[in-house]
């Protein structure tokens, strides 16, 4: 555990400057939304910028994981590290997901404020209970980012494991991408879809706009299965183990 904490502190220290860049970028985008909304007298512009920021936030963790992997690959210090590949990858995932979790909490608070602001201005078609929506969307965001981050780890590890096949490894990566998409389309997606009737929950994450003298926002429900979350986590963990075993072969990057 002490070695893991040491790796975690190293990864956090390595990328904290880029975290500030992300935070400044998010503040700039949200601030731009407020300026445009104020000048156009259309408060719903703020909602549009909020949705855009929330979408791009899903890619924060994968981007930071890739950044850590590139730094690790250039230094090659991991080749002499007594920790296994699982600890090395886990520390990078933990640091990246920690960043994302903190920013998600801040964005959630902003979203709740925005919802009440639109409610006070009578710009909502109808009131909805967003309590479960807030919790489930935060879970979905973290799990989705974890899945993409582990995908980055798998592809990075496989790519560098083919160092002796430089003329073929890009072709091999294209084949891997095709297999990955096939696996997701015909195995994972049908599996998750088949479980949608187990533990269904309502999430208000769809929306539409209506014009009645002023533009109003309508939040629409969709139904998700809570069972899909543990399925995604188990598959992601198995992929992480596979990448870790491959890294433990001490592939030179």
UniProtKB/Swiss-Prot annotation:
GO terms for cellular component: plasma membrane. It is found in: Cell membrane. The keyword Amino-acid biosynthesis does not apply. Keywords: Cell membrane, Membrane, Transmembrane, Transmembrane helix. The chain crosses the membrane at residues 17-37, 46-66, 93-113, 139-159, 172-192, 222-242. It comes from the Bacteria. The keyword Transmembrane helix applies. It is a multi-pass membrane protein. This is Uncharacterized protein YhcE. It comes from Bacillus subtilis (strain 168). The lineage of its organism: Bacteria, Bacillati, Bacillota, Bacilli, Bacillales. The gene is yhcE.
């Amino acid at each position: 555990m002490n070695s893991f904490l040491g790796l975690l502190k190293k990864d956090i220290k390595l990328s904290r400057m880029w975290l500030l860049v992300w935070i400044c970028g998010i503040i700039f985008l949200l601030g731009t939304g407020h300026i445009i909304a104020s000048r156009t007298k259309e408060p719903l512009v703020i909602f549009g910028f909020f949705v855009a920021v929330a979408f791009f936030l899903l890619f924060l963790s994968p981007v930071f994981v890739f950044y850590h992997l590139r730094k690790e690959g250039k230094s090659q210090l991991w080749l002499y590290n007594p920790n296994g590949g699982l600890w090395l990858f886990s520390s990078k995932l933990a640091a990246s997901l920690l960043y994302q979790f903190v920013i998600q909490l801040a964005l959630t608070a902003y979203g709740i404020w925005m919802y009440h602001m639109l409610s006070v201005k009578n710009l909502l078609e109808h009131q909805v209970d967003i309590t479960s929506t807030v919790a489930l969307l935060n879970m979905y965001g973290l799990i989705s980012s974890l899945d993409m981050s582990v995908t980055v780890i798998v592809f990075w590890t496989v790519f560098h494991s083919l160092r002796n096949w430089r003329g073929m490894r890009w072709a091999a990566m294209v084949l891997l991408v095709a297999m990955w998409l096939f696996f997701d389309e015909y195995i994972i997606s049908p599996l998750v879809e088949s479980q949608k009737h187990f533990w269904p929950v309502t999430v208000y994450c769809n929306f539409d706009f209506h014009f009645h003298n002023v533009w109003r926002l309508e939040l629409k429900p969709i139904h998700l299965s809570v069972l899909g979350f543990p399925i995604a986590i188990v598959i992601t963990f198995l992929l992480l183990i596979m990448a870790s075993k491959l890294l433990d072969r001490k592939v030179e990057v």
